[in-house]
Protein backbone atom coordinates (compact mmCIF):
# COMPACT_ATOMS: atom_id res chain seq x y z
CA UNK A 1 0.00 0.00 0.00
CA UNK A 2 1.25 3.49 -0.83
CA UNK A 3 1.51 5.61 2.34
CA UNK A 4 -0.57 8.78 2.34
CA UNK A 5 -1.46 11.73 4.51
CA UNK A 6 -4.59 12.51 2.48
CA UNK A 7 -7.73 12.65 4.61
CA UNK A 8 -10.44 10.11 3.98
CA UNK A 9 -13.37 8.42 5.65
CA UNK A 10 -11.12 6.20 7.76
CA UNK A 11 -7.91 8.24 7.61
CA UNK A 12 -8.72 11.27 9.76
CA UNK A 13 -5.65 13.51 9.61
CA UNK A 14 -4.49 16.19 12.01
CA UNK A 15 -4.94 19.85 11.10
CA UNK A 16 -4.48 23.08 13.02
CA UNK A 17 -8.14 23.08 14.07
CA UNK A 18 -8.42 19.36 14.92
CA UNK A 19 -8.99 16.23 12.86
CA UNK A 20 -10.03 16.42 9.21
CA UNK A 21 -12.25 13.79 7.56
CA UNK A 22 -12.94 13.83 3.82
CA UNK A 23 -16.18 12.20 2.67
CA UNK A 24 -15.98 11.10 -0.95
CA UNK A 25 -19.42 11.36 -2.53
CA UNK A 26 -20.02 9.13 -5.58
CA UNK A 27 -20.31 11.63 -8.41
CA UNK A 28 -20.88 14.35 -5.81
CA UNK A 29 -24.28 12.92 -4.90
CA UNK A 30 -25.99 12.45 -1.57
CA UNK A 31 -29.55 12.38 -0.32
CA UNK A 32 -31.14 14.47 2.40
CA UNK A 33 -30.78 11.69 4.98
CA UNK A 34 -27.04 11.47 4.33
CA UNK A 35 -26.69 15.26 4.46
CA UNK A 36 -28.34 15.22 7.89
CA UNK A 37 -25.98 12.47 9.00
CA UNK A 38 -22.94 14.54 7.99
CA UNK A 39 -24.35 17.57 9.80
CA UNK A 40 -24.97 15.46 12.90
CA UNK A 41 -21.45 13.98 13.06
CA UNK A 42 -19.88 17.39 12.40
CA UNK A 43 -21.74 18.72 15.42
CA UNK A 44 -21.32 15.65 17.64
CA UNK A 45 -17.66 14.89 16.96
CA UNK A 46 -16.22 18.08 15.45
CA UNK A 47 -16.41 21.85 15.45
CA UNK A 48 -19.49 21.89 13.24
CA UNK A 49 -17.48 23.30 10.34
CA UNK A 50 -17.89 21.56 6.97
CA UNK A 51 -16.11 22.32 3.71
CA UNK A 52 -17.05 21.66 0.09
CA UNK A 53 -14.06 20.62 -2.03
CA UNK A 54 -13.16 21.23 -5.66
CA UNK A 55 -13.77 17.55 -6.40
CA UNK A 56 -17.41 17.73 -5.30
CA UNK A 57 -16.80 16.13 -1.91
CA UNK A 58 -17.40 17.29 1.65
CA UNK A 59 -15.02 17.32 4.60
CA UNK A 60 -15.65 17.66 8.31
CA UNK A 61 -13.22 19.82 10.29
CA UNK A 62 -12.28 20.18 13.93
CA UNK A 63 -12.77 16.53 14.89
CA UNK A 64 -11.99 16.07 18.55
CA UNK A 65 -9.29 13.72 19.82
CA UNK A 66 -10.48 10.17 20.31
CA UNK A 67 -13.70 10.64 18.32
CA UNK A 68 -12.59 9.74 14.80
CA UNK A 69 -13.71 6.12 15.12
CA UNK A 70 -17.23 7.04 16.20
CA UNK A 71 -17.48 9.59 13.39
CA UNK A 72 -16.40 7.04 10.77
CA UNK A 73 -18.87 4.44 12.04
CA UNK A 74 -21.75 6.93 11.90
CA UNK A 75 -20.87 7.90 8.33
CA UNK A 76 -20.66 4.24 7.29
CA UNK A 77 -24.06 3.59 8.88
CA UNK A 78 -25.45 6.42 6.73
CA UNK A 79 -24.22 4.71 3.57
CA UNK A 80 -21.46 7.24 2.95
CA UNK A 81 -18.65 4.72 2.59
CA UNK A 82 -17.69 2.26 -0.13
CA UNK A 83 -20.17 -0.53 -0.86
CA UNK A 84 -17.51 -3.17 -0.18
CA UNK A 85 -15.24 -3.70 2.83
CA UNK A 86 -17.57 -1.78 5.17
CA UNK A 87 -17.18 -4.61 7.67
CA UNK A 88 -13.54 -5.37 6.79
CA UNK A 89 -10.33 -4.21 8.38
CA UNK A 90 -9.37 -0.54 8.36
CA UNK A 91 -6.73 -0.96 5.64
CA UNK A 92 -9.15 -2.60 3.21
CA UNK A 93 -11.84 -0.03 3.95
CA UNK A 94 -9.40 2.86 3.49
CA UNK A 95 -8.20 1.48 0.15
CA UNK A 96 -11.75 1.03 -1.13
CA UNK A 97 -12.58 4.55 -0.02
CA UNK A 98 -9.43 6.08 -1.52
CA UNK A 99 -10.15 4.87 -5.06
CA UNK A 100 -13.56 6.56 -5.21
CA UNK A 101 -11.98 9.58 -6.89
CA UNK A 102 -14.46 9.71 -9.78
CA UNK A 103 -15.78 13.15 -10.69
CA UNK A 104 -19.00 13.58 -12.66
CA UNK A 105 -20.73 16.72 -13.81
CA UNK A 106 -23.39 17.90 -11.32
CA UNK A 107 -26.35 17.20 -13.66
CA UNK A 108 -25.11 13.74 -14.65
CA UNK A 109 -28.08 11.53 -15.47
CA UNK A 110 -30.43 14.53 -15.55
CA UNK A 111 -29.22 16.89 -18.28
CA UNK A 112 -31.41 16.59 -21.42
CA UNK A 113 -28.44 17.69 -23.58
CA UNK A 114 -26.05 14.98 -22.34
CA UNK A 115 -24.78 12.42 -24.83
CA UNK A 116 -24.78 9.56 -22.31
CA UNK A 117 -26.20 8.91 -18.87
CA UNK A 118 -22.88 9.25 -17.09
CA UNK A 119 -24.45 8.52 -13.70
CA UNK A 120 -25.50 5.08 -14.93
CA UNK A 121 -22.07 4.58 -16.49
CA UNK A 122 -20.38 5.55 -13.22
CA UNK A 123 -22.03 2.85 -11.09
CA UNK A 124 -20.17 -0.17 -12.53
CA UNK A 125 -17.00 1.91 -12.74
CA UNK A 126 -17.12 2.68 -9.02
CA UNK A 127 -17.88 -0.96 -8.27
CA UNK A 128 -14.84 -2.07 -10.28
CA UNK A 129 -12.60 0.43 -8.50
CA UNK A 130 -13.77 -0.73 -5.07
CA UNK A 131 -13.20 -4.41 -5.89
CA UNK A 132 -9.93 -4.18 -7.82
CA UNK A 133 -7.38 -6.30 -5.89
CA UNK A 134 -4.59 -3.82 -6.66
CA UNK A 135 -6.49 -0.76 -5.39
CA UNK A 136 -4.15 -0.72 -2.36
CA UNK A 137 -1.34 0.38 -4.69
CA UNK A 138 -3.06 3.54 -5.93
CA UNK A 139 -2.53 6.96 -4.39
CA UNK A 140 -5.65 8.56 -2.84
CA UNK A 141 -4.95 11.50 -5.14
CA UNK A 142 -5.26 9.43 -8.32
CA UNK A 143 -8.41 10.78 -9.97
CA UNK A 144 -10.73 10.03 -12.88
CA UNK A 145 -13.19 12.30 -14.68
CA UNK A 146 -16.28 11.08 -16.53
CA UNK A 147 -17.90 13.75 -18.72
CA UNK A 148 -21.19 12.77 -20.34
CA UNK A 149 -21.43 15.91 -22.46
CA UNK A 150 -23.60 17.82 -19.99
CA UNK A 151 -23.95 21.59 -20.41
CA UNK A 152 -22.52 22.24 -16.95
CA UNK A 153 -19.04 20.77 -16.71
CA UNK A 154 -15.67 21.42 -15.08
CA UNK A 155 -13.40 21.23 -18.12
CA UNK A 156 -10.28 22.84 -16.64
CA UNK A 157 -9.70 20.38 -13.80
CA UNK A 158 -6.83 17.98 -14.70
CA UNK A 159 -7.33 14.29 -13.91
CA UNK A 160 -5.04 11.26 -14.19
CA UNK A 161 -7.57 9.68 -16.55
CA UNK A 162 -10.31 11.63 -18.27
CA UNK A 163 -13.28 10.20 -20.16
CA UNK A 164 -15.65 12.23 -22.32
CA UNK A 165 -18.63 11.32 -24.48
CA UNK A 166 -18.49 12.39 -28.12
CA UNK A 167 -20.65 11.75 -31.18
CA UNK A 168 -18.97 10.15 -34.16
CA UNK A 169 -19.78 11.13 -37.74
CA UNK A 170 -22.10 8.13 -38.15
CA UNK A 171 -24.09 9.23 -35.09
CA UNK A 172 -22.64 6.65 -32.68
CA UNK A 173 -21.79 7.94 -29.21
CA UNK A 174 -18.34 6.89 -28.03
CA UNK A 175 -16.22 7.51 -24.94
CA UNK A 176 -12.98 9.36 -25.67
CA UNK A 177 -10.14 9.03 -23.19
CA UNK A 178 -6.95 10.87 -22.34
CA UNK A 179 -4.28 10.94 -19.65
CA UNK A 180 -3.05 13.57 -17.20
CA UNK A 181 -5.26 16.39 -18.43
CA UNK A 182 -8.75 17.46 -19.42
CA UNK A 183 -11.14 16.93 -22.34
CA UNK A 184 -9.88 19.15 -25.19
CA UNK A 185 -11.79 22.41 -25.62
CA UNK A 186 -9.31 24.89 -27.11
CA UNK A 187 -7.99 24.48 -30.65
CA UNK A 188 -4.45 23.74 -29.45
CA UNK A 189 -5.42 21.29 -26.71
CA UNK A 190 -4.01 17.76 -26.72
CA UNK A 191 -6.50 15.42 -28.43
CA UNK A 192 -7.95 12.24 -26.97
CA UNK A 193 -5.70 9.20 -27.22
CA UNK A 194 -8.32 6.48 -27.72
CA UNK A 195 -12.06 5.95 -27.82
CA UNK A 196 -14.28 2.99 -26.95
CA UNK A 197 -17.95 2.04 -26.91
CA UNK A 198 -19.66 3.12 -23.66
CA UNK A 199 -20.05 -0.55 -22.69
CA UNK A 200 -16.25 -0.93 -22.74
CA UNK A 201 -15.54 2.03 -20.44
CA UNK A 202 -14.98 -0.01 -17.28
CA UNK A 203 -12.61 -2.42 -19.04
CA UNK A 204 -10.65 0.50 -20.49
CA UNK A 205 -10.23 2.24 -17.15
CA UNK A 206 -9.15 -0.96 -15.42
CA UNK A 207 -6.58 -1.66 -18.14
CA UNK A 208 -5.19 1.88 -17.85
CA UNK A 209 -4.98 1.59 -14.06
CA UNK A 210 -3.15 -1.73 -14.23
CA UNK A 211 -0.77 -0.40 -16.87
CA UNK A 212 -0.03 2.59 -14.65
CA UNK A 213 0.66 0.36 -11.64
CA UNK A 214 2.86 -1.97 -13.70
CA UNK A 215 5.00 0.86 -15.08
CA UNK A 216 5.12 3.40 -12.23
CA UNK A 217 8.02 3.25 -9.75
CA UNK A 218 7.07 3.25 -6.08
CA UNK A 219 7.66 7.01 -5.79
CA UNK A 220 5.51 7.87 -8.84
CA UNK A 221 1.90 8.30 -7.77
CA UNK A 222 0.38 10.41 -10.56
CA UNK A 223 -0.07 9.85 -14.28
CA UNK A 224 1.68 13.06 -15.34
CA UNK A 225 4.90 12.01 -13.62
CA UNK A 226 4.83 8.58 -15.26
CA UNK A 227 4.19 9.98 -18.74
CA UNK A 228 7.24 12.21 -18.35
CA UNK A 229 9.40 9.09 -18.25
CA UNK A 230 7.67 6.43 -20.35
CA UNK A 231 5.23 8.24 -22.67
CA UNK A 232 1.57 7.61 -23.43
CA UNK A 233 2.18 5.08 -26.21
CA UNK A 234 4.12 2.80 -23.85
CA UNK A 235 1.31 2.92 -21.32
CA UNK A 236 -1.35 2.26 -23.97
CA UNK A 237 0.61 -0.71 -25.28
CA UNK A 238 0.73 -2.13 -21.75
CA UNK A 239 -3.01 -1.52 -21.32
CA UNK A 240 -3.74 -3.30 -24.59
CA UNK A 241 -2.46 -6.55 -23.10
CA UNK A 242 -5.34 -6.53 -20.59
CA UNK A 243 -8.09 -5.87 -23.15
CA UNK A 244 -10.05 -8.23 -25.41
CA UNK A 245 -10.59 -5.48 -28.00
CA UNK A 246 -8.07 -3.34 -29.91
CA UNK A 247 -7.27 0.09 -28.53
CA UNK A 248 -7.55 2.71 -31.24
CA UNK A 249 -8.61 6.28 -31.86
CA UNK A 250 -11.12 7.26 -34.50
CA UNK A 251 -9.30 9.54 -37.00
CA UNK A 252 -11.88 12.25 -36.32
CA UNK A 253 -10.80 12.41 -32.67
CA UNK A 254 -7.74 14.43 -33.61
CA UNK A 255 -9.98 17.36 -34.52
CA UNK A 256 -12.76 16.71 -31.99
CA UNK A 257 -13.20 19.40 -29.36
CA UNK A 258 -15.54 19.26 -26.45
CA UNK A 259 -18.12 22.08 -26.50
CA UNK A 260 -17.26 24.80 -23.94
CA UNK A 261 -19.29 25.05 -20.76
CA UNK A 262 -20.58 28.35 -19.40
CA UNK A 263 -19.49 28.60 -15.73
CA UNK A 264 -22.47 30.85 -14.96
CA UNK A 265 -24.84 27.90 -15.46
CA UNK A 266 -23.91 26.56 -12.02
CA UNK A 267 -26.15 29.25 -10.56
CA UNK A 268 -29.94 29.21 -10.66
CA UNK A 269 -32.49 26.89 -12.26
CA UNK A 270 -31.38 24.47 -14.97
CA UNK A 271 -33.67 22.23 -17.06
CA UNK A 272 -33.63 18.47 -16.53
CA UNK A 273 -35.10 15.47 -18.31
CA UNK A 274 -38.20 15.36 -16.10
CA UNK A 275 -40.93 17.65 -17.52
CA UNK A 276 -41.90 20.45 -15.16
CA UNK A 277 -38.83 19.93 -12.98
CA UNK A 278 -35.43 21.60 -12.69
CA UNK A 279 -32.26 21.61 -10.62
CA UNK A 280 -31.34 24.79 -8.73
CA UNK A 281 -27.68 25.60 -8.17
CA UNK A 282 -25.77 27.83 -5.78
CA UNK A 283 -22.29 28.07 -4.28
CA UNK A 284 -21.04 27.96 -0.72
CA UNK A 285 -19.20 31.20 0.02
CA UNK A 286 -15.50 30.27 -0.13
CA UNK A 287 -16.48 26.60 0.11
CA UNK A 288 -17.42 26.89 3.79
CA UNK A 289 -20.65 25.80 5.46
CA UNK A 290 -21.61 24.44 8.85
CA UNK A 291 -23.77 21.72 10.35
CA UNK A 292 -26.80 23.97 10.70
CA UNK A 293 -26.68 25.08 7.07
CA UNK A 294 -26.27 21.53 5.79
CA UNK A 295 -29.18 20.36 7.92
CA UNK A 296 -31.37 23.15 6.55
CA UNK A 297 -30.21 22.36 3.02
CA UNK A 298 -31.40 18.79 3.54
CA UNK A 299 -34.78 20.08 4.71
CA UNK A 300 -35.00 22.27 1.61
CA UNK A 301 -34.26 19.30 -0.65
CA UNK A 302 -37.04 17.32 1.03
CA UNK A 303 -39.56 20.16 1.03
CA UNK A 304 -39.11 21.46 -2.52
CA UNK A 305 -37.08 18.81 -4.37
CA UNK A 306 -36.80 15.06 -4.70
CA UNK A 307 -34.62 14.77 -1.60
CA UNK A 308 -31.30 14.61 -3.45
CA UNK A 309 -28.35 16.98 -3.74
CA UNK A 310 -25.22 17.15 -5.87
CA UNK A 311 -22.06 18.87 -4.73
CA UNK A 312 -20.16 20.60 -7.53
CA UNK A 313 -16.48 21.08 -8.46
CA UNK A 314 -16.98 24.81 -7.79
CA UNK A 315 -17.62 24.20 -4.08
CA UNK A 316 -21.35 24.48 -4.62
CA UNK A 317 -24.54 22.45 -4.68
CA UNK A 318 -27.56 21.62 -6.82
CA UNK A 319 -30.97 20.87 -5.32
CA UNK A 320 -32.63 18.36 -7.66
CA UNK A 321 -36.22 17.62 -8.63
CA UNK A 322 -37.57 21.11 -7.96
CA UNK A 323 -40.88 22.04 -9.59
CA UNK A 324 -40.10 24.73 -12.17
CA UNK A 325 -42.52 27.14 -10.55
CA UNK A 326 -40.83 26.70 -7.17
CA UNK A 327 -37.33 27.53 -8.45
CA UNK A 328 -37.42 31.19 -7.28
CA UNK A 329 -38.50 30.04 -3.81
CA UNK A 330 -35.60 27.59 -3.62
CA UNK A 331 -33.16 30.21 -4.90
CA UNK A 332 -34.31 32.66 -2.23
CA UNK A 333 -34.01 29.96 0.43
CA UNK A 334 -30.44 29.19 -0.66
CA UNK A 335 -29.59 32.89 -0.48
CA UNK A 336 -31.12 33.06 3.00
CA UNK A 337 -28.76 30.24 4.01
CA UNK A 338 -25.82 32.42 2.97
CA UNK A 339 -25.06 30.72 -0.35
CA UNK A 340 -23.94 32.64 -3.43
CA UNK A 341 -26.83 32.51 -5.92
CA UNK A 342 -25.67 34.85 -8.70
CA UNK A 343 -22.67 34.78 -11.05
CA UNK A 344 -22.37 38.52 -10.44
CA UNK A 345 -21.68 38.12 -6.73
CA UNK A 346 -18.10 39.20 -5.82
CA UNK A 347 -17.58 35.79 -4.18
CA UNK A 348 -18.71 33.81 -7.24
CA UNK A 349 -15.18 33.37 -8.64
CA UNK A 350 -13.18 33.73 -5.44
CA UNK A 351 -11.49 30.70 -3.85
CA UNK A 352 -9.52 30.54 -0.60
CA UNK A 353 -7.65 27.70 1.08
CA UNK A 354 -8.33 26.75 4.70
CA UNK A 355 -5.97 29.48 5.89
CA UNK A 356 -4.32 29.81 9.27
CA UNK A 357 -7.58 28.99 11.05
CA UNK A 358 -7.30 25.42 9.78
CA UNK A 359 -3.75 24.88 8.51
CA UNK A 360 -0.46 25.28 10.36
CA UNK A 361 1.40 26.04 7.11
CA UNK A 362 -0.78 29.03 6.20
CA UNK A 363 0.58 32.49 6.95
CA UNK A 364 -2.78 34.28 6.93
CA UNK A 365 -6.47 33.76 7.60
CA UNK A 366 -7.29 33.54 3.91
CA UNK A 367 -11.04 33.06 4.24
CA UNK A 368 -11.46 36.08 6.48
CA UNK A 369 -9.25 38.13 4.16
CA UNK A 370 -11.21 36.95 1.11
CA UNK A 371 -14.48 38.15 2.62
CA UNK A 372 -12.88 41.53 3.31
CA UNK A 373 -11.56 41.71 -0.26
CA UNK A 374 -14.92 40.82 -1.78
CA UNK A 375 -16.59 43.59 0.21
CA UNK A 376 -14.01 46.13 -0.94
CA UNK A 377 -13.80 45.11 -4.62
CA UNK A 378 -17.53 44.74 -5.14
CA UNK A 379 -17.16 43.09 -8.57
CA UNK A 380 -16.41 39.59 -9.84
CA UNK A 381 -12.76 38.63 -10.07
CA UNK A 382 -11.26 35.22 -10.80
CA UNK A 383 -9.12 35.18 -7.67
CA UNK A 384 -7.39 32.60 -5.47
CA UNK A 385 -6.10 33.36 -1.98
CA UNK A 386 -3.56 30.84 -0.74
CA UNK A 387 -1.87 30.76 2.64
CA UNK A 388 1.39 29.28 1.35
CA UNK A 389 3.17 28.05 -1.78
CA UNK A 390 1.19 24.78 -1.91
CA UNK A 391 -1.72 26.67 -3.51
CA UNK A 392 -4.43 24.40 -2.07
CA UNK A 393 -8.15 24.62 -2.95
CA UNK A 394 -7.75 25.31 -6.69
CA UNK A 395 -6.52 22.80 -9.30
CA UNK A 396 -5.19 25.43 -11.72
CA UNK A 397 -3.95 29.04 -11.52
CA UNK A 398 -6.66 31.70 -11.31
CA UNK A 399 -6.55 34.93 -13.30
CA UNK A 400 -5.10 36.52 -10.16
CA UNK A 401 -3.51 34.82 -7.14
CA UNK A 402 -2.73 36.28 -3.74
CA UNK A 403 -0.03 34.33 -1.85
CA UNK A 404 0.15 35.11 1.86
CA UNK A 405 3.49 36.35 3.18
CA UNK A 406 2.16 37.19 6.65
CA UNK A 407 -1.10 37.94 8.45
CA UNK A 408 -3.31 40.01 6.09
CA UNK A 409 -0.36 40.59 3.69
CA UNK A 410 -0.02 39.06 0.23
CA UNK A 411 2.01 38.95 -2.97
CA UNK A 412 -0.17 39.47 -6.06
CA UNK A 413 0.28 37.48 -9.30
CA UNK A 414 -1.47 37.74 -12.66
CA UNK A 415 -1.77 34.67 -14.87
CA UNK A 416 -0.13 35.20 -18.26
CA UNK A 417 2.52 33.48 -20.32
CA UNK A 418 4.93 33.25 -17.40
CA UNK A 419 5.44 29.94 -15.62
CA UNK A 420 3.65 29.00 -12.44
CA UNK A 421 1.19 31.56 -11.15
CA UNK A 422 2.23 34.10 -13.77
CA UNK A 423 3.78 37.54 -13.35
CA UNK A 424 4.30 39.03 -9.89
CA UNK A 425 2.53 42.41 -9.86
CA UNK A 426 3.19 43.55 -6.30
CA UNK A 427 4.66 42.38 -3.00
CA UNK A 428 3.51 42.55 0.62
CA UNK A 429 0.15 44.16 -0.13
CA UNK A 430 -2.33 44.86 2.64
CA UNK A 431 -5.96 43.89 2.03
CA UNK A 432 -6.83 47.48 1.12
CA UNK A 433 -3.87 47.71 -1.28
CA UNK A 434 -4.76 44.37 -2.87
CA UNK A 435 -8.37 45.51 -3.31
CA UNK A 436 -7.19 48.68 -5.01
CA UNK A 437 -4.92 46.79 -7.42
CA UNK A 438 -7.57 44.21 -8.25
CA UNK A 439 -10.17 46.92 -8.72
CA UNK A 440 -7.94 48.43 -11.41
CA UNK A 441 -7.58 45.13 -13.31
CA UNK A 442 -8.96 45.25 -16.83
CA UNK A 443 -12.01 43.01 -17.34
CA UNK A 444 -10.21 41.28 -20.23
CA UNK A 445 -7.68 39.96 -17.72
CA UNK A 446 -10.43 37.91 -16.10
CA UNK A 447 -11.66 34.93 -18.14
CA UNK A 448 -15.05 35.15 -16.46
CA UNK A 449 -15.60 38.62 -17.93
CA UNK A 450 -14.18 37.81 -21.38
Regions found by a protein language model. Give the residues of each.
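Residues that form generic nucleotide/phosphate-binding pockets
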Residues: 128, 211, 238, 242, ...
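Gly/Thr-rich phosphate-binding loop signature of adenosyl cofactor/nucleotide-binding cores
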Residues: 1-39, 87-90, 240-299, 340
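Flexible, glycine/charged-enriched surface loops at secondary-structure junctions
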Residues: 48-52, 86-87, 135-139, 213-238, ...
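Mobile "lid/hinge" segments at catalytic clefts and subdomain interfaces of large enzymes
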Residues: 138, 142-229, 396, 401-450
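Well-ordered beta-strand positions enriched in small/hydrophobic/aromatic, beta-favoring residues
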Residues: 102, 177, 280-282, 412
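Short acidic (Asp/Glu) and glycine-rich catalytic loops that position anionic groups and cofactors
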Residues: 16-17, 183-188, 215-219, 274-278, ...
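Small-residue-enriched alpha-helical segments and adjacent helix-cap loops
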Residues: 18-172, 194-195, 203, 284-407
Amino acid sequence: MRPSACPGLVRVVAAADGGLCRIKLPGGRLDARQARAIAAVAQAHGSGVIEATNRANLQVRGIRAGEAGALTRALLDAGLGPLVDADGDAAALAASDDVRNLMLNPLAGRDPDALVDSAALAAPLLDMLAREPRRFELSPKFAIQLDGGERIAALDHPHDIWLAAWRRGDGAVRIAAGLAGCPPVAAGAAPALVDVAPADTVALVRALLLAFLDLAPADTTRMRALLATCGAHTLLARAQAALPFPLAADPALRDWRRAPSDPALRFGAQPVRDPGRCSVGAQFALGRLDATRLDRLAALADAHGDGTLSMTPWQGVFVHGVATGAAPTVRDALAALGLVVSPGDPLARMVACAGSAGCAKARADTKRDALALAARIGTVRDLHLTGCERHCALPHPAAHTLVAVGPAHYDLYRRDGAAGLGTALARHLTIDEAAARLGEARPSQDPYDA
